[in-house]
Amino acid sequence: MQAKYKRVLVKISGEALAADKHTGFDFAFVSRVCEAVKACADEGVQIGIVIGGGNFWRGVKDGAGKVERVSADRMGMLATAMNCLAVCDVFRQLGADARILTAMDIQGVGERFDARKAIEYLERGSIVLFACGSGHPFFSTDTAAVLRAAEIQADAILLAKNIDGVYSDDPRKNPDAVRFDEISYDEVLARHLAVMDTTATSLAMDNNIPVIVFALAEPENIGKVLEGEKLGTIVQ
C-alpha cells in the first residue's frame, strides 16, 4: 500500500456497527471493518478511531424529554465505551494490538486519555480507540473525533458514514441532489450541509484537517481512501 496519509482518525457511527440489525452489533460486519482497518495498520498507517454510541443510545432523541441533556449525553458516552470494548476485542482476536483511551475514568475499560500516550501507542503500531467522546456533555462524537484528530496531529479524518459523500441535499428525499467531489469548510457551514455538526466542522477548519466523507457499506473503502483513491467527498 502506498498510503497518502501516515496518521488518520477514523470516525465510525454506532449505527454502522449494528448494520441492518439497527441496534447492538452485527459482528460479521464489525469483523469486516476491523479486518480492513488492521490491513491498513499492518502497512504502517497509524490509526485512531472514534466510535459513536447510536446503536445503544441516541442522547436527547432517546431521552424523549424524560432525561436531562447532561444525563442523556453521559449515557451516550457510556455507549461509546461499550462499543470500544467490543471492537477492541474483535481487533485482538484478529491479532492486532488495540488500546482504549477514555475521556472519563472508567476502571477496567481503558486508560485515561492523554495525547502524548496516544501518539506513543500509535507510533508503536497500536490501533487506538478513543472512548467517551470528549468527556463533556453538549458535544457530539463528531466534535470529539475532530478534537482527538487535532490532539494526535492526524493528517486527515476519515468520516465513515451510511452515505457515499456530501450532497447538495438529502439524496434519499431529493433525486436531483448532487454529490460533491470536493467542498470547502466555509461552503459546508454556509449551506448547512449534513456532514458534521457546525462545532466539529469549525474545529476541523480552524486546525486545517481535511475530512474525507465516504460510505462504510464496503469496509474496504477505508484502504482505498488511504491510498488516495477518489471516493466520496473531501472537505478542506
Predicted feature locations:
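C-terminal catalytic "cap/lid" subdomain
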Residues: 1-236
